[in-house]
Amino acid sequence: MTASVSTSRQRIVSLWLKRLQTDRRARLQAPDPRPHAVAGRRGNAEEILALDAAAENMGLRRGLSLAQARAMCPALVVFEEDTSTDARLLKDIADWCQRYTPLVGLDAPDGVLLDIAGCAHLFGGEAALIDDLMRRVRAFGFMAHVGVAGTIGAAHAVARYGQGGFIAPGCECERLLSLPLSALRITDGTVASLSRVGFKRIGDIVDLPRAPLAARFGTGVLRQLDRALGLEGEPLTPLLPVAPYFAEQPFPEPIAREEDILAVIERLARRLAAMLERRGEGLRRVELALFRTDGKVHRIEAGTSRPIRNPSDVRALFVERLATLADPIDPGFGFDLARLSVTVAEAAPARQVTLGDEADDTDLGHLVDRTSARLGARRVTQLIAQDSHTPELAAVSLPAHSARADEERGWDAFRRHRAAADLPARPLRLLARLPLAARVA
């Protein structure tokens, strides 16, 4: 194939949790040497969906009917499928993977995707990052395979069908040629149709004329092939929006005390303040993520009524939030990583205060921020002018955090409309009852 060099700037890690369903159950019970499987209804029959190592060693495989599996292995322990619990677990694992990069997405039902482009050097390189990832995932009790490539399709294929490993940038075509067509993430029906005419591996279709291939088997085959080879872009959809600013701190020894957490918050806020000041911005919403040593992640958000940069103000916000959490933070065996992220930032240019300035509203802002953090954002409200001549619609009550941001915009819009329409001023007095107008014939 002439155009076989990937132009992707991604560096994708595909983490495949092959036995996610059985591993989840094994973590919740005492060690049991008997073979285990998860079964679910597919059509009119119960089908084997997942197997542990002992069941695979007995010759069982996915796709067998439950009756066949029991005939082959009478001692098989079978669990019912629980897709919602498995999906929550996969999301929790993906959430934990954000310790490596904010660009983390799901490869459901049993995979996680990470884009480590630009951040692998923080862990000593790609190999060191993958070693740390695999060590931690296995310590949590999950069997995992990992593939690293310049595209989502190639990383997915090498993790699940190519025994894992790294694909150097631009070498996707060379590594994928020997893999089965199912590695392209095409439907089983399409794979079967291709197999009937003798196409079983990716290398069998790479150099075929594209128009006849698309006409007979659909454009999806070519699309997935081009995506795997990096000839067509495929963005990774992150689990959470990527914060414009964030700072993090790993801990050689896990921390658990609240005073240590607050000290870390202030230290990270200083680093964020420097970033924000360079761009003339301040934070409006900030999130604290605490990564526990056992894989659980605690996230706490706080908001402000105006853009701020002062580290002590950020610390004060979280003092109130930590004191009023409905579900207090359980540190477990401690947190080994803390990350402070600015999720919403606004312009906050520096200004010089002179003796002629009007009263500063900083104290009012502090009051709004702290009471909102303690009582809840919806419990502290403010009236905001609206562009309406109906008195009962002339103002609305909004949470103070959003209201103070919209206050100037609301008044400005109202004044501009009145000026453009050349409307008279509102009357100082409204009659309780409208007078009747007499009609003269």
Which residues are covered by each model-predicted region?
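Flexible hinge/switch segments at interdomain interfaces of large molecular machines
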Residues: 106-108, 170, 239-243
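Hydrophobic (often cysteine-bearing) scaffold residues that line and stabilize catalytic clefts
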Residues: 86-89, 125-129, 221, 257, ...
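Short, conserved phosphate-binding/catalytic loop or strand-edge motifs used
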Residues: 109-114, 152-155, 189, 208, ...
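Amphipathic, charged-and-aliphatic alpha-helical interface segments
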Residues: 58-60, 172-207
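Hydrophobic alpha-helical positions that pack around
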Residues: 125-173, 178, 303, 314-328, ...
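Residues that scaffold, gate, or flank divalent-cation-dependent active/transport sites
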Residues: 1-113, 118-120, 127-128, 132-135, ...
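DNA-contacting surface of Y-family translesion DNA polymerases
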Residues: 14, 75-76, 191, 195-335, ...
